[in-house]
């Protein structure tokens, strides 16, 4: 049998292949994202995907999804109780064995079975030689796999311009790429019953829509985490836009915000905390009571409110975060927040890294409850060390490393997270959830978080991009898309005329 052996520590593109014997001329391996820890697949020997053996715990989920993916050609699902008790396997660990006798999945949990099925879907192709699909085949071989980082998350923004299908597609892609958490940040788009004025009138992030997305996420094995900004970014809008999702339409609520642009919440106003606590409880319940809640906390301004300025701001800041954290803890969740306001700008220890805090906020941070999770964001290229991560870890906090769209940075930060033993990685997307950025972010992030020590290409070339497009197309089938605008990664194949460079 002619095999490709994927030795991931010396990976070239998605795989580096060492082939026993002569491979078929021009044969191209199918890509698996994220890269499995160990994978050996044939280039030429295939098995019909008409029967699969799984443990009892995953039986109903597997049967449902195979029917959804493959319709009348769905493989028969067989339960083997002998593979259910894989005591040596971790909760997310699986093994796939494909030979002439069929396909067997070894795993001990539903989540691991899900991951095995996502892998199989990426390597299954229609039987050849027919006009329409009449069956499926998979390459023979063996895959053994498990994640190297525990918390593998992505941060998704829901802007006023964002349509619900775009959020759903990102959730589905994150789950397909074996991420286990997705933070959903509303940018004035959550329709609140507690404070109907707090957001844009045409908000699309309704409780009904969240319930629908949560059901999808739960089924696919990814947990949704809500976010409300409780310090800076109170405008729920990008700074460059100059908008304020509350005050532009409802100026009577100005006392809740700092006078300077309303960018900060007013921490000295007791009504501010009362409102935020009510909003947090509402959002937490809308998201089905998840284990975490993100409170933002980045890029705040110095106080312009005379009441805030006249008080020891370090104490005001500390009391505010303590109260918010106590509310979240009482709900049964842990607080997550960005790091940049927690260290002092001008401190030479942080030169070259993201620092927006003052002496006051840095001092207040030292007294924070240690159950808060610090989300350390850095969006530039690879660094040999990340002193801010080390600092927060040394202070006794759980830490997540948070890259954005720099491929080298995503890889380096994921490797540093793995090496330093912190909680994990939370990749960010911001307003780059379409076009060329989408394949770059999700491909690099998924691979770096799952198997950080593997070689991962920093050049998202046509081959890699096309494989991501293939996976996005599969997600489009799951979403039963009909609108051509919802296909691919660009809304339009040719940009509008003013943007054409003739």
Which residue ranges define each predicted feature?
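Bacterial N-terminal signal peptides
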Residues: 7-16
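Conserved short loop/turn motifs at secondary-structure junctions
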Residues: 22, 198-202, 405
